[in-house]
């Protein structure tokens, strides 16, 4: 997966999302080093067993037009190299730079921010024209962008069903995209334990606390039975992924724990494409 686009458009968020899903990631890689990088990662490993995500943009100061030639050569060796291009409106980019107070990568040319953005659009146009997908992040927040990367690009092949286990806080609404929704507020709440309060459902202390609760074991067993029975029936559906969402009061302890637990179970059952997304945490 090749991640490119305008500075401030969300490329770093996308790469971090791929990394969280066990892609081997490298950012700001010069195009001319891409062939050697891929060869080094594939050496001794079948092509299908490797997931790579590479960030390429104007910071590398390399000839971006070389990428098309490399992608064609990679395809001949059975390597699928998809190119995602992230962009946003000038207004959105200027606001993001104002909020973060970071310098634009082309500011060393003595350009004001609007001019630097315009120049970067010109330099990255060769990448945009050959992109497999152009993602406009002008109206997306970080959580929405991460979710879109997970569901549309990171979960792999669209000819097989992928599973996304999501956690959320009811006080911020139920995810509109959820196919299954389970209420974890019926479970004991680690929030009331002062030592567990600052932790999340991914931490060992919270896991041990909930693992030792009989109601949690019963709740989990019943959900496992339901999902194991009905998820395989959806393989013949036209959808490419299914979202199973767990909600609790704050989206921090119980819902995160359940999403992670069910994702582990799905992987143990042999589902090839499984991801987690914690809306209030990621």
From Swiss-Prot:
Q: Which family does it belong to?
A: Belongs to the RapZ-like family.
Q: Which PANTHER family match?
A: RNASE ADAPTER PROTEIN RAPZ
HAMAP family, alphabetized: RapZ_like (MF_00636)
Superkingdom field: Bacteria
The protein here is known as Nucleotide-binding protein XAC2976
* MF term (GO), any: ATP binding
Q: Quote the record's binding site residues for ATP.
A: 5-12
| ATP-binding listed as a keyword | yes
Question: Which residues take part in binding GTP?
Answer: 57-60
Task: Give the originating organism.
Answer: Xanthomonas axonopodis pv. citri (strain 306)
Task: Give UniProt keywords alphabetically.
Answer: ATP-binding, GTP-binding, Nucleotide-binding
User: What does the UniProt record say this protein does?
Assistant: Displays ATPase and GTPase activities.
